[in-house]
Amino acid sequence: MSPTACVLVLALAALRATGQGQIPLGGDLAPQMLRELQETNAALQDVRELLRHRVKEITFLKNTVMECDACGMQPARTPGLSVRPVALCAPGSCFPGVVCTETATGARCGPCPPGYTGNGSHCTDVNECNAHPCFPRVRCINTSPGFHCEACPPGFSGPTHEGVGLTFAKTNKQVCTDINECETGQHNCVPNSVCVNTRGSFQCGPCQPGFVGDQRSGCQRRGQHFCPDGSPSPCHEKADCILERDGSRSCVCAVGWAGNGLLCGRDTDLDGFPDEKLRCSERQCRKDNCVTVPNSGQEDVDRDRIGDACDPDADGDGVPNEQDNCPLVRNPDQRNSDKDKWGDACDNCRSQKNDDQKDTDRDGQGDACDDDIDGDRIRNVADNCPRVPNFDQSDSDGDGVGDACDNCPQKDNPDQRDVDHDFVGDACDSDQDQDGDGHQDSRDNCPTVPNSAQQDSDHDGKGDACDDDDDNDGVPDSRDNCRLVPNPGQEDNDRDGVGDACQGDFDADKVIDKIDVCPENAEVTLTDFRAFQTVVLDPEGDAQIDPNWVVLNQGMEIVQTMNSDPGLAVGYTAFNGVDFEGTFHVNTATDDDYAGFIFGYQDSSSFYVVMWKQMEQTYWQANPFRAVAEPGIQLKAVKSSTGPGEQLRNALWHTGDTASQVRLLWKDPRNVGWKDKTSYRWFLQHRPQVGYIRVRFYEGPELVADSNVVLDTAMRGGRLGVFCFSQENIIWANLRYRCNDTIPEDYERHRLRRA
């Protein structure tokens, strides 16, 4: 008996059981049978509809049918009645699109279609986006089934991408190719300037060779001579026209050239003096007395027209410098009464050894034999600040250390211990600095506004950075035409917007703005590293000796003579925004290690360093960890949890990140070391208020390395200095710094690209 017939018999039996009555005999049989068959067919239609929507009931009926076959039930005796078999793979048995197979045990569903997971009967959508099939920064949209990726991000191109299933998503990634905007013309660099393609974007650089100007004023072919304001330039073809604060124009010879700007000659060693004399009268027009060795002070003790920096017998006494115990003072007899490193002719303590020749008050008498080291007319034995002039000898905390030199003037600490070299004694050093400018909150005149310079023009205890009336003249800074100089009347005879009281000298420090390195800070007027702090970064190590620093050219040149442990020479002036430049030169063919400079120095655990290694080398002391130095220029942020010592020493040597010590912010991808006896000019821009850092290096007139924009806010300002590590005979010449809080144009472009 077929399953359909069995169902028919069951339906007829059900009809009779519900009181439909017996089938009558006789002449009325045919109509009655017809009606019952019609009713039966209607009932079967209901059953079929029920089978479509209820899978469980279908399964039950299938099992019932199979049981009917097993019981051997006979066809109904009703004449003329036929039945059809019920299909095992009824509609809805399997998920749409899944193959259904009839078996002896019932219907069997095949696998779920691509993009779904389940048993074939029930399938759910797979989220292919979890496999990250799209290009970074591109949104993935999951669909049912499959996925698709949105368009490639700005700066990239590529086809649309979509697919179905995890396997496809894992093995087929969206491909977006960098657009070279410099080749396609999709950039906004001014004509005749350098366009540098970057991943997903581009950067605009200086003018191309043969052109002068910048991205703001445009690049004109040399010979056209235009100034930034568009006026014809009076400068030499190798000079740049600079627009000063007062609107006047100045001419400055380009890197690799020297002179007065109206005339420029080749400057091989980049010390600011031309190789040959120029036909102009200014000092910088004179012939360089050491053409290949930078000596920005042009010192020449024996006046033989050969500078001391390159004269094998600088003092002309017949004794070579290497053997001369007074290389800069003529002393052919080489007499040395106290047997130190210095002959009597140049020894500031002839009868007492003092190799350091330190002379705090610069009176010609070394500290080692001077009974009044600071020159305040109080003998050392009675002076509570023997190295700092303090006539009043005040000592607020009574610890025997005068307030003028006490690193905790309100707290008893006679030992003056200061492990992090920040001039705040450990006894009162909280290390709480919420604005990150290097001044702890209790000593910061603007605790919540970064102002590393701590400038306070009206000396009211409130820093200019958070004072709305810097000069305390009753006129708010926002409308004061002399913000730093009291002028309540606001006189301005020429009506140029700058008050008469500060015309030409904005900070009234008696140094005109044109030559003032910080025209808005009366405390800083000229570049000067004559007073500096020595910081030894591995004080306990015995691998090498400490650095030996020599300052020349009235504080604008520093020489380090020894193969030494890592160390710093740090100036005392702190800066907010700053431009820092100088000439770097290793004047020897001996060794191949690190030299560089620092900025943002806040303490011996917190500073930025730009350092250059000549050759790859593993540090010779593997304790506390192996450190490998790679050749090339590196920019690092130092935030050491231990401070000076072997941990920081090895972290500085290592090219890369070291946890809790050093982060590598940028490395010159050329991996090129410095060359022996070759001069390089660096230019640093630091704007701590936004974290902007950019450093460039020139070899002669050619740009050889450019970090482009680096953003980091670990140090919100600080002091400047120079750095050495295991390298002798380093010269930092023609040093210049300048206060500058103006945000460079490329900062905004970089910020938008990152966003």
Swiss-Prot record:
Phosphoserine: residues bearing it: 394
Localization of this protein: Secreted, Extracellular space, Extracellular matrix
- Pfam families associated with the record: COMP, EGF_CA, TSP_3, TSP_C
Q: Self-association or partners: how does it assemble?
A: Pentamer; disulfide-linked. Exists in a more compact conformation in the presence of calcium and shows a more extended conformation in the absence of calcium. Interacts with ITGB3, ITGA5 and FN1. Binding to FN1 requires the presence of divalent cations (Ca(2+), Mg(2+) or Mn(2+)). The greatest amount of binding is seen in the presence of Mn(2+). Interacts with MATN1, MATN3, MATN4 and ACAN. Binds heparin, heparan sulfate and chondroitin sulfate. EDTA dimishes significantly its binding to ACAN and abolishes its binding to MATN3, MATN4 and chondroitin sulfate.
Gene Ontology molecular function: any one: collagen binding
Ranges where the TSP C-terminal domain occurs:
530-744
Which cysteine pairs make disulfide bonds?
A: 89-100, 94-109, 112-123, 129-140, 134-149, 152-176, 182-195, 189-204, 207-219, 227-241, 235-251, 253-264, 280-285, 290-310, 326-346, 349-369, 385-405, 408-428, 446-466, 482-502, 518-739
**SUPFAM superfamilies per record:** Assembly domain of cartilage oligomeric matrix protein, Concanavalin A-like lectins/glucanases, EGF/Laminin, Growth factor receptor domain, TSP type-3 repeat
Question: Which keywords does the record carry?
Answer: Apoptosis, Calcium, Cell adhesion, Disulfide bond, EGF-like domain, Extracellular matrix, Glycoprotein, Heparin-binding, Phosphoprotein, Repeat, Secreted, Signal
Name this protein carries in UniProt: Cartilage oligomeric matrix protein
- Ranges for the region named Mediates cell survival and induction of the IAP family of survival proteins are 525-755
Q: Which residues form the signal peptide?
A: 1-19
State the TSP type-3 repeat positions.
Answer: 266-298, 299-334, 335-357, 358-393, 394-416, 417-454, 455-490, 491-526
How is the co-factor bound, per the entry? Binds 11-14 calcium ions per subunit.
Q: Basic and acidic residues composition bias: which ranges? A: 332-344, 350-365, 412-424, 456-465
Please list the cofactors this protein needs. Answer: Ca(2+)
Q: What does this protein do?
A: Plays a role in the structural integrity of cartilage via its interaction with other extracellular matrix proteins such as the collagens and fibronectin. Can mediate the interaction of chondrocytes with the cartilage extracellular matrix through interaction with cell surface integrin receptors. Could play a role in the pathogenesis of osteoarthritis. Potent suppressor of apoptosis in both primary chondrocytes and transformed cells. Suppresses apoptosis by blocking the activation of caspase-3 and by inducing the IAP family of survival proteins (BIRC3, BIRC2, BIRC5 and XIAP).
Entry comment on modification after translation: Proteolytically cleaved by metalloproteases ADAMTS4 and ADAMTS1 with ADAMTS4 showing more potent activity.
